[in-house]
A protein has these predicted regions:
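N-terminal binding-site loop/beta-alpha segment at the start of enzyme catalytic domains
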Residues: 1-76, 137
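Acidic (Asp/Glu)-rich catalytic clusters
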Residues: 10-16, 47, 66-77, 97-106, ...
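Active-site mouth loops of central-metabolism enzymes
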Residues: 24-36, 81-91, 117-119, 214-216
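Iron-sulfur cluster-binding cysteine motifs and their immediate structural context
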Residues: 57, 281-299, 307-322, 340-353
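Active-site groove signature of glycoside hydrolases
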Residues: 100-120
């Protein structure tokens, strides 16, 4: 069996497997596996050689990861990257302490600011960033970085470096089609990532398959990302052992095995349940502009079988009369299946499966 290839992501960490486990998929925002089942999946991945995992405070899946670490043979070999939306010192300290306690780890390998957009958001989160640097110096975390969907944020990291504020790692959205890149093309993102990587900053990508949009040409899409000289590792979401086997095969041999189930057969999408209340929180949360509020016409039920005239006189809508209500709708061509909208829905009407 071929060994899973590794790379130096940053001098502050041992080599990481180029295939990183994107753990969003196993938690409550996507597949919603139980911690027990997720632990089985994760430990299988770790025992097969994946030694790098991406998570976030927002994902609410630390219990799942802890179960995987407890089940695997060598938990000490697994490096964990987490992220936080914290913007001040108190929030950053709380986020790191939460991860350490929930994961039962004294040290978190990589901690990042989540979803940065530009130099302006980096400056707005500077207190949290400085706190992460201080924790790195104390040995509580080993490396510091950001995640982003924006070329402008990568430019911002370069600008900070010129000012003497040097990040260890950047975790950008990058795929062949450019789906999900908020402010440019794949060529734009590749150009700025090349400049950043040349400074010594580590880069591990996300959304290589664009949240499932590129499943039908998964091999071509993954190869494109892995062939980029600046790409040290790639986080790929996986939900079961079969997906782990398929991706490990590709990362080690450059091809999916013939007996692997077709990836297009497991294509996922965002589902919006009928009981959506149309509050608009998901629309405001979506950075891709994939969600909108729309009017839905529905026929009403009249359990009392009132006549139309009587119903009208009493202000009651007659049975079968269409009424309009506001609900959320998704544009599947824009949705990257990040699942972040599901976390803000008060009635859990959004699900990725």
């Amino acid at each position: 069996m071929s060994e899973l290839p590794g790379r130096i992501l940053t001098k502050r960490l041992p080599p990481v497997s180029r295939l990183a486990f994107g753990s969003l998929t196993v938690g409550p925002l996507q597949a919603d596996l139980t911690p027990e089942r997720a632990g089985e999946v994760l430990s299988y991945a770790f025992d097969r050689g994946i030694n790098f995992l991406d998570t976030a405070q927002y994902y609410r899946n630390y219990a799942h990861i802890r179960a995987g670490l407890q089940k695997c043979r060598r938990p000490e070999d697994v490096m964990i990257s987490s992220k936080t939306y914290a913007y001040d010192r108190a929030g950053a300290l709380e986020a790191v302490d939460e991860a350490r306690l929930a994961l039962d780890r004294d040290v978190i390998d990589l901690f990042m600011l989540h979803e940065q957009e530009s130099i302006h958001t980096l400056r707005g989160h500077r207190e949290a960033l400085d706190t992460l640097f201080a924790l790195r110096e104390k040995g509580v975390i080993r490396a510091v970085g950001i995640s982003t969907h924006h070329t402008a944020a990568v430019e911002g990291v370069l600008q900070l470096a010129e000012e003497g504020v040097v990040l260890d790692v950047v975790h950008p959205l990058f795929n062949k089609a450019g789906i999900g890149i908020a402010d440019g093309t794949p060529a734009d993102m590749a150009a700025v990532l090349t400049r950043l990587h040349d400074t010594g900053c580590g880069i591990f990508g996300m959304k290589a398959l664009a949240g499932g949009h590129l499943f039908q040409n998964a091999g071509e899409a993954l190869a494109y990302v892995l062939e980029q000289p600046f790409m040290d590792a790639v986080a790929v979401g996986m939900q079961d052992e079969a997906e782990i086997d398929a991706n490990i095969a590709f990362f080690t041999t450059g091809a999916f095995p013939a007996n692997t189930r077709s990836l297009e057969k497991i294509r996922r999408r965002l589902h919006i349940e009928e009981y959506c209340e149309g509050c608009g929180r998901c629309v405001r949360r979506c950075q891709q502009g994939a969600l909108v509020l729309t009017e839905s016409k529905e026929e009403t039920e009249n359990p009392y079988d009132f006549g139309a005239a009587f119903a009208a006189s009493e202000g009651i809508v007659s049975a079968g009369e269409p009424v309009s209500r506001t609900v959320a709708a998704v544009d599947p061509d824009k949705c990257v299946l990040c699942g972040y909208c599901t976390a803000v829905c008060p009635v859990f009407a959004l699900k990725v499966y």
